[in-house]
Amino acid sequence: MHQERVNKVLDLMAQKNLTQMIISDPSAIFYLTGTWIQPGERLLALYLTQTGKHKLFVNELFPFADAIQCDKVWLNDNMDGIGVLAEYVEKDKPVAIDKNWPARFLIGLIDKKAGSTFVNGSEIVDRVRMVKDAEEIKLMREASRLNDLA
């Protein structure tokens, strides 16, 4: 996990009085974890919480996700992934959800009443990603240098 980036997300969540967020966009998960997972139709969710008990909900078909430095909840195609995720969500508090989560997952979570309300949390991750950290600046400069050579 890129802990500094996660901390920035948590800070913006706190400013909006949000204690939990579900991130499903593979590019946002890559940004926060450093591991690219393309789940296809399967559930992939990074659950961030102000308590620090972050969880990555990921299918067993992606064992390389084990390298990510956070707790994993392994799912398989025979499980009710949304039901498993709902067990971890604080049901009496709002849940921030990113803009790219398929409706079939969000509606399932709503049906399980796994949050007091649901809000669009995409602005939080988007704002953090707008400001590049030193590592990103270095990588962008190197990419530009290589592009200039081509």
Annotate each predicted stretch with a short phrase.
Residues 1-149:
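A composition/biophysics-driven feature that prefers long, compositionally simple stretches
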